[in-house]
Amino acid sequence: MKASILLMISFFLLLSCSKNEPDESNQDAASIDDDLAGPISRPKAGYGSDGNYQVAKISFPSPLYSGKNVEIFYPKGTISPKPVIFYSHPYGGELSEYNIGLYEFIAKKGYVVVFAPYPTTGVTVEERYDTLWQSFKKAVRDYPGIIDTKKVGFMGHSFGAGACFALAHRGFIDEGWGENGRFIFAMAQWYSYEITQAELQSFPENTKLITQVYNDDITNDHRLAIDIFKNINIPDTEKDFILIKKSVLPTFTYTAEHNLPNTQSSYDAYDYYGIYRLLDAMIDYSFNGNTAAKNVALGNGSKEQVTMPSYNGQALSPLEVTDNPSALYPQSKYSFQCSGLNNPRIANCN
């Protein structure tokens, strides 16, 4: 099994670092000269707009990954602990620069994010999970003046999204984190290890969930995300399954491939409107109880949730939201299929 996982990882590395070109804005947008690819700029106000905090960073040696540092991004000038998001990266995304826009967005909004690298090769899946977990635990233990464990989110992409559920269960159940707010935000999910069906059915009642899949992803079978979404005990009112599709403008294409979001290959309006905007609202709803935020993050297909921006009168593809997802494509489309022998939940493939 170890050899086959190493082959998978090699394939992941080829796919983790590419993304095409995109475009958007919640109103009809004119071309603005900023650092985003494509003609559509960031939201200027509301959810998804940049916060006012400057970003500070602390690094400390990884407890299990020799020579690597765990990084904590937080609002500069913090004088009291802030709510925290523990981020689990995809295969090959060991450097925070790969998705630095996301981490800085979180810190600018006044929250903390912990980025923990794990080895891409030479270790087992379980060892990667342990590296993530021990890194998160050390951050909490060593920086109580920055991290407030009463309000906690777990977020991840691909391998990291699959890991989110086991890690969140440890944090929420074993450690009691998140008593005043809990959520999970899973993107382009890979296989989920180290979590049983009974554990999936035992998440605390204040846990929220956004699961995102990307229509042109040919890496991870959407059935992996569908399985966990349907089997977790979070009620439909507190979770949404979201599909993002590409948008083609005359001069730019906003893609919805496996590597959405990332800051390296194409940092664009899809990062902001498709991911940051929903995350921003999810944080506000989960941590502050703002019901208006719920309509954006978990709106069950509300206009406020699904509407993407326009450019020169052409609207970008709206988000597609459901509580009862089904697979749109055959497993043969994907490199990592639900029926793959390395899937510990293979019995749940439909």
Residue ranges with predicted function:
Residues H222-N350:
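C-terminal catalytic-base region of ester-bond hydrolases, centering on the histidine
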Residues L95, A116-F136, Y143, L200:
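Catalytic nucleophile-loop/oxyanion-hole region of alpha/beta-hydrolase
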Residues L14-A37:
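Bacterial Sec-dependent N-terminal signal peptides
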Residues S96-F115:
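Short amphipathic alpha-helix adjacent to the substrate-entry channel of hydrolases
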Residues W177-L249:
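The feature captures the conserved acid-bearing segment of alpha/beta-hydrolase catalytic domains
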Residues P81-P90:
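Short beta-strand element of the alpha/beta-hydrolase
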Residues A30-S80:
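N-terminal cap/lid segment of alpha/beta-hydrolase-fold proteins
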Residues G77-S80, E127-G162, R170:
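Gly/Ser-rich "nucleophile elbow"/oxyanion-hole loop immediately N-terminal to the catalytic nucleophile
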